């Protein structure tokens, strides 16, 4: 039979029947930490994982019942645990005007589970789900709008900053966490007063006590930056990490995932990759390419950090990104210290978006092969992704 999937705190009861005389019956194996109650008199079997994860418990095992040293019943069971190394999350943003975001989960047996957060917590995460991060036995979620959409519609969301137990998905923290930036277009931008609401967009957790959140401002994303969140109090700082705040897609933090690797955080900023030291919360290195935009970063299977830059371009990219390219797009590889180890031009057919409406190209990397995946077209509505081999330079067009 196929393995039986069970949720933490659930139970399955079975009525047992025998097709003939069985002289002796005994249970010879059961998952460690689970309840496995075999009642011969009542001819019943009850299987239940614990309500919470406990150290040393089996996530999956086999219940075996035998007679005269011969198995007469054997069934595999597993608990739906969201930390399994072979599980995969798919984050669905939702729509800012009509519905909240959600997540789906493919478990280690490639079974598809919908609305795992909603079923466990009896509510939705929030409006415009942006990012999630697993660390310290927890899952951290970021939503852009929280309980209220940018159109003012109230949804049944838990907030803009939500923390769950990584094993069970049970909600631990739910905060709407509004924060603001002061935008003065005549003199530049500071972060001293409550003037413009900020939209949290990406998170990286650097320790059990601290995380960084990248955000952009709610005035059509004119500015962006990175701030510190205290994970003990779940309060976000009122000022930015120096060197991360500026004009969106030009001098401010890129609306893209940050990478935490070997004690450092790698992030995009305008035309640069910046390296932050969580010990000092300071930018300790900047790698800049003039007249380009950094679009995304990802950590390759070889341990290097890969950044993808647009080609060199002229003109104001504006919201839709009508740029004229003079040099091709480029992949830059950096080592653990942020030193450039290679610069590789991409084929000239690859023209990456430059407008503020398309700040990233959704790049990710394979954990096991030298492949990067990203959108290589300027079309705002493009839905194809290509695969790039950073060892051979080979491109598989429209791979996804």
What are the residue ranges of the model-derived segments?
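Short, solvent-exposed loop/linker segments at beta-strand-coil boundaries, enriched for Pro/Gly
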Residues: 22-37
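Post-signal peptide N-terminal segment of secreted/secretory-pathway proteins
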Residues: 40, 46-55, 94-199
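C-terminal edge beta-strand
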Residues: 72-82
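Structural motif
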Residues: 97-104, 149-162, 220-228, 271-277, ...
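A short beta-strand motif characteristic of beta-propeller blades
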Residues: 111-124, 170-193, 234-248, 282-288, ...
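Loop/turn-rich, solvent-exposed surfaces of beta-rich toroidal or solenoidal domains
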Residues: 354-400
């Amino acid at each position: 039979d196929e393995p039986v999937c069970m949720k933490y705190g659930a139970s399955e009861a079975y009525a047992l029947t025998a097709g003939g005389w069985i002289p002796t019956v005994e249970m010879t194996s059961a998952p460690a930490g689970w309840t496995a109650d075999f009642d011969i008199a009542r001819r019943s079997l009850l299987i239940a994982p614990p309500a919470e994860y406990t150290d040393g418990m089996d996530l999956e095992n086999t219940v075996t019942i035998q007679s005269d040293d011969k198995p007469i019943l054997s069934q595999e069971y597993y608990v739906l645990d969201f930390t399994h190394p072979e599980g995969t999350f798919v984050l669905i943003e939702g729509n800012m005007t009509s519905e909240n975001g959600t997540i789906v989960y493919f478990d280690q047996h490639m079974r598809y589970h919908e609305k795992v957060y909603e079923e466990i917590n009896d509510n939705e995460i929030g409006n415009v789900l942006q990012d999630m991060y697993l660390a310290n036995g927890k899952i951290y979620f970021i939503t852009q709008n929280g309980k209220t959409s940018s159109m003012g519609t109230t949804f049944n969301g838990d907030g803009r900053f939500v923390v769950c137990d990584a094993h069970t998905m049970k909600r631990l923290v739910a905060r709407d966490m509004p924060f603001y930036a002061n935008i003065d277009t005549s003199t530049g931008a500071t972060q001293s007063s409550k003037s413009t609401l900020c939209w949290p967009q990406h998170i990286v957790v650097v320790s059990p006590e601290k995380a960084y959140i990248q955000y952009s401002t709610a005035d059509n994303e004119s500015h962006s930056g990175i701030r510190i969140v205290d994970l003990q109090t779940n309060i976000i700082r009122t000022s930015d990490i120096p060197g991360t705040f500026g004009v969106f897609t030009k001098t401010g933090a890129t609306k893209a995932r940050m990478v935490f690797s070997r004690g450092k955080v790698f992030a995009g900023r305008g035309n640069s990759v910046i390296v932050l030291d969580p010990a000092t919360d300071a930018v300790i290195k900047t790698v800049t390419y003039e007249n380009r935009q950094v679009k995304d970063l990802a950590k390759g299977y070889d341990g290097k950090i890969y950044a993808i830059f647009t080609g060199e371009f002229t003109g104001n990219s504006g919201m839709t990104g009508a740029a004229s390219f003079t040099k091709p797009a480029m992949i830059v590889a950096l080592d653990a210290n942020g030193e450039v180890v290679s610069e590789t031009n991409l084929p000239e057919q690859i023209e990456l978006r430059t407008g503020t409406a398309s700040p990233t190209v959704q790049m990710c990397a394979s954990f096991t092969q030298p492949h990067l995946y990203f959108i290589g077209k300027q079309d705002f509505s493009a839905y194809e992704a290509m695969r790039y081999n950073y060892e051979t330079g080979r491109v598989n067009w429209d791979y996804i």
